[in-house]
Design a protein with these regions (language model features):
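Activity-critical C-terminal alpha-helical subdomain
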Residues: 194-330
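Short, extreme N-terminal segment that most often corresponds to the first beta-strand
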Residues: 1-15, 186-188, 234-240, 376
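Short runs of predominantly hydrophobic/aromatic residues within well-ordered alpha helices
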Residues: 105, 115, 241-242, 366
Length: 377
């Protein structure tokens, strides 16, 4: 991310604030290959200002460093954030910039304890660029954090509380609170089939976010179908995070003796592993089954999706009642573990790779999620 500190900032700002901002922007931990930010300053325009001369007394190699940075910047295509007194969508005063750039980027999840494993797998396998994983580097330095919203329905409440800390700053600068948010909300869709409009509960969540003046444009089309063209909100295109687990995970589970001796688990896995329709794998409710949902009248789409199972329907409809393994390899009971806490751990396994994640993904969504996160950094 490029940050341009403009001429009027050098001419009109308090040096203490300018110096503090410069240290935030230019700081690079010794363990990192790259700094968090790139800084663009046209030294020809600012080098005669009092503030620049003062900054040089603290940073003896300032001019050489900034000229090298600026040469990279002018030959690139990145649109910078600006630190300036002029108004603009990506323009901030020094006071605003200190708050905005010093905060970590947030990935808001329904449950960060469980769901983070999925996102970390996406970052690990899709974020590597010539041996450098920028997103992982930001996590390692505390510049990118996972936030726990406390459930899907609670996301608007979480965001309202999160944004409250910007209230005074926003009022002082006549801005929306959301202008200071650096992050993305990632939400399960709970969709039951491919072209299902967003569920009323999710529409309510979006409406509440809109009521907080959070931009929800591009999440849905006019028919309430997912388009996911919003930079700060991503609703998963499959049913839930577990639907992105590669088949290799379930193949590994069924190899275990304790599973092979449990007829219910073995039967469910045998049927699941023989499903060939991607839409079935994308939208099956893995833990609960209940293939036709809770509709008073079963939608045609669900009849089409699951009506070809024959005698396998009843077994698959029971759901995958798997709660994890004990250290001795035996199965945990529902009192000892839970599907939601155990299954995300499988994203960490060595046999989960970019290739089998892409195969299960099928349309490049995981790369798009990674790209959305990366643009925030």
């Amino acid at each position: 991310m490029w940050i341009n500190i403009t001429k009027n900032t050098f001419q009109n700002s308090d040096f203490k604030g300018l110096n503090f901002l410069y240290q935030i922007i230019s700081y690079k931990p010794t363990s990192s290959i790259k700094p968090r930010y790139n800084i663009a300053i046209d030294t020809e325009k600012v080098k005669n200002s009092v503030n620049f001369q003062l900054l040089k007394t603290i940073e003896p190699s300032l001019e050489e460093f900034l000229e090298a940075e600026y040469n990279v910047y002018v030959n690139g295509t990145d649109i910078p954030y600006k630190v300036t007194s002029q108004k603009g969508n990506q323009n901030y005063t020094i006071e605003e910039a200190i708050v905005f750039f010093n905060q970590p980027v947030s990935i808001v999840l329904e449950n960060n304890k469980n769901d983070a494993s999925f996102i970390l797998a996406v970052i690990k396998h899709f974020g590597n660029d010539n041996g450098y994983n920028k997103v992982q580097d930001h996590i390692d330095n505390g510049w990118l954090v996972f936030e726990n919203a406390g459930g899907c329905a609670n996301i608007p409440n979480f965001m309202e509380g999160f944004l409250r800390k910007f209230k005074i700053l926003a009022a002082k600068n006549s801005r929306n609170l959301f202008d200071y948010f650096r992050g993305i909300m990632i939400i399960d869709s709970d969709k039951e089939y491919q072209n299902q409009p967003i569920k009323p509960a999710h529409k309510t969540i979006l409406d509440k976010l809109h009521g907080l003046l959070i931009d929800i444009s591009g999440v849905l089309d006019a028919s309430d179908l997912l388009t996911n063209q919003n930079r700060s909100i991503h609703i998963l295109e499959k049913r839930m995070m577990e639907n992105y687990l590669p088949k290799e995970v379930f193949q590994e589970i069924i190899r275990q003796n304790s599973v092979r001796s449990n007829s219910d688990l073995k039967d469910w896995l045998d049927i699941y592993l023989n499903l060939i329709a991607e839409e079935q794998l994308d939208f099956i409710n893995i833990p609960d089954g209940n293939l036709y949902g809770n509709h008073s009248t079963v939608p045609t789409e669900l009849n089409t999706l699951w009506g070809n199972l024959g005698g396998n329907f009843a077994k698959l409809n029971q759901g995958f009642k798997f709660y994890g393994f004990k250290t001795n390899g035996r199965l945990k009971s529902s009192k000892e573990g839970s599907f939601k806490s155990e299954m995300p751990n499988w994203f960490k396994k060595a046999f989960v790779t970019k290739q089998n994640l892409e195969t299960r993904d099928g349309n490049g969504e995981l790369q798009r999620v990674l790209d959305k996160i990366a643009t925030l950094l």
